[in-house]
């Protein structure tokens, strides 16, 4: 696979790979911001923005409708490190994708109505995932055991429901202009599109988006764990459950993938070592 690269004057990095076997083009834009960049008393903002980014921009009040009319689809996800948005569109309508992504990078439609709508969606998601089902709050219990100083200690959805509930429009604007910048993003384009056309469309639609002052990340260092940490919680749940976590190498470490595979071998699915060796009522 041939990978092509181009950097715009405003700092946006373009990564491209051509695939002529398909009639589709995919655009993936990754912003270098996640839950680790949040203030400890204002968590859940990165995930809230994943939702706000679909609430319309200054020139495009409805993000989904133009994409659907062009035969495209989209989605997004957030974790502690990054926020990722992607769309696919037929090759003949590829410029629609560039138009949509560049306009919401330039400026969202910061309205109180949009904030209230998306705030409600995120709060309902928090309740359904973390409060209204057995074991839903395990991330809120396990993470502070594993990380006592580093901001990995709270899940992406937020440390406390009140943080999103009390978020103001000014705080939301400040978060956007702090992190949603071309010089803090990577645009990946793949599918039935040449490198020359990808560069041309990227320059056309993203070239005028101004570079912004992105803060230097200065995260607290997590001290080495020297002893076991354990928490026992009694809850009215169907079955007892055991959750164990181990520190492992970072993504950029050469041993990361070895540990990732090891975790699957040990505990992922019905053929994992843990599943096959633990006694069950059927044996």
Regions found by a protein language model. Name each.
Residues 1-22:
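N- or domain-start disorder-to-order transition segments that initiate the globular core
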